[in-house]
């Protein structure tokens, strides 16, 4: 909707509409309206001239009020308190505009605008026989009122929206405060729980520290004891090594003596060879017989082992079988080792005797040849 602008000028759109709606007045109507508007202008001018000065009116009012001061003496105390309040607001009141003066100025400006409008209408009637300025003013005023209504409606809607937003904001604040209270309660509970956990952790840490300290001390004592035992074992091993060295030296000396004695006794091996060979063969035969008996005993032990194995549980069967097999292998290896040692000893002795016997025969043959010569 088009209205009057801030400078008091009528917009071109309203002027165009007023021109379209304004009709030509009849001479009689024009004269009648002209006389009415002229009288109105004269009365407005007279009102402007008869207007009383505000200062004079204020002076007269002051005189009339002075006559009533005696009646208000009894209310002096009340007025003094009010006066103190007014004195406190004096600085603010000084800076406020004079509402009466402002209203009078507004009336004067409206009167001048009306005079100008009526003058324009008179000129328009005299020239064109129309009241177009008056129509334009009325239409502009209606447009301004419509714009004002729309503005007021928008303001109401805006105010309602603001009120609703404020209510929503208030509810949101209340909801937020309620949530914050709940969160504070939860935070307080969590703080209490954290405090309890810290206390429990401190107690547990102290207990674990003492426990670890005691365990470490016990472990150090055990390690110290084990170290002392190992040192003792090391001393014993060192003594055994020294003893072994002494024994080895003694054995070496003994072997050297044996070698010397064997060198001295090598001449006697030829005569002793046959007897030793027979004795070794006899011992070998005895070993074979013993081996055969051992095989028979071994078979019996295996049969007995199988019979006992069937009567035991599966778990004990495996353990017993491994143990007896280990014992059997150890016994057999021992027997074999013993037999191998005996056979090797016999075989070495046999070879030595053969060597010695061969040397003796060669010596005997050489002696016989010499005798023949």
From Swiss-Prot:
Domain IQ, residue spans: 336-365
Pfam families in alphabetical order: IQ
Positions in coiled-coil regions: 145-200
One GO CC term on file: motile cilium
InterPro entries, per database record: IQ_motif_EF-hand-BS, IQCG
Localization per Swiss-Prot or TrEMBL: Cytoplasm, Cytoskeleton, Flagellum axoneme
Similarity remark: Belongs to the DRC9 family.
Annotated protein name in UniProt: Dynein regulatory complex protein 9
Organism the protein comes from: Chlamydomonas reinhardtii (Chlamydomonas smithii)
Gene from which the chain derives: DRC9
């Amino acid at each position: 909707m088009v209205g009057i602008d801030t400078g008091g000028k009528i917009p071109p759109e309203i002027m165009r509409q007023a021109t379209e709606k304004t009709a030509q007045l009849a001479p009689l109507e024009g004269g009648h309206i002209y006389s009415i508007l002229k009288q109105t202008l004269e009365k407005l001018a007279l009102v402007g001239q008869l207007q009383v000065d505000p200062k004079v009116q204020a002076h007269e009012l002051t005189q009339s009020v002075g006559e009533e001061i005696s009646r208000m003496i009894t209310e002096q105390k009340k007025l003094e308190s009010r006066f103190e309040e007014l004195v406190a607001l004096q600085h603010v009141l000084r800076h406020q505009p004079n509402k009466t003066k402002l209203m009078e100025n507004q009336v004067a400006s409206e009167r001048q605008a009306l005079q100008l409008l009526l003058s324009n209408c008179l000129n328009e009637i005299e020239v064109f026989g129309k009241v177009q300025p008056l129509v334009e003013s009325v239409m502009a005023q209606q447009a301004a009122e419509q714009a004002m209504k729309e503005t007021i409606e928008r303001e109401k809607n805006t105010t309602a929206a603001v009120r609703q937003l404020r209510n929503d904001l208030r509810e949101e604040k209340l909801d937020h405060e309620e949530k914050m209270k709940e969160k504070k309660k939860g935070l307080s509970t969590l703080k209490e729980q954290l405090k309890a956990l810290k206390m429990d952790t401190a107690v547990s840490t102290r207990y674990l520290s003492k426990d670890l300290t005691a365990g470490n001390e016990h472990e150090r004592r055990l390690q110290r004891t084990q170290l002392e035992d190992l040192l003792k074992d090391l001393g014993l091993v060192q003594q055994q090594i020294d003893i072994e060295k002494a024994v080895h030296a003694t054995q070496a000396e003994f072997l050297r003596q044996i070698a010397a004695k064997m060198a001295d006794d090598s001449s006697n091996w030829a005569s002793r060879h046959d007897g030793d060979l027979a004795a070794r063969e006899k011992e070998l035969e005895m070993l074979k017989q013993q081996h055969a008996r051992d095989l028979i005993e071994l078979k019996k032990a295996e049969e007995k082992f199988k019979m006992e194995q069937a009567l035991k549980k599966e778990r004990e069967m495996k353990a017993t079988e491994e143990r007896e097999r280990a014992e059997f292998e150890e016994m057999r290896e021992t027997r074999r080792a013993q037999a191998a040692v005996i056979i090797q000893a016999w075989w070495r002795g046999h070879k030595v005797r053969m060597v010695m016997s061969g040397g003796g025969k060669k010596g005997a043959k050489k002696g016989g040849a010499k005798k023949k010569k």
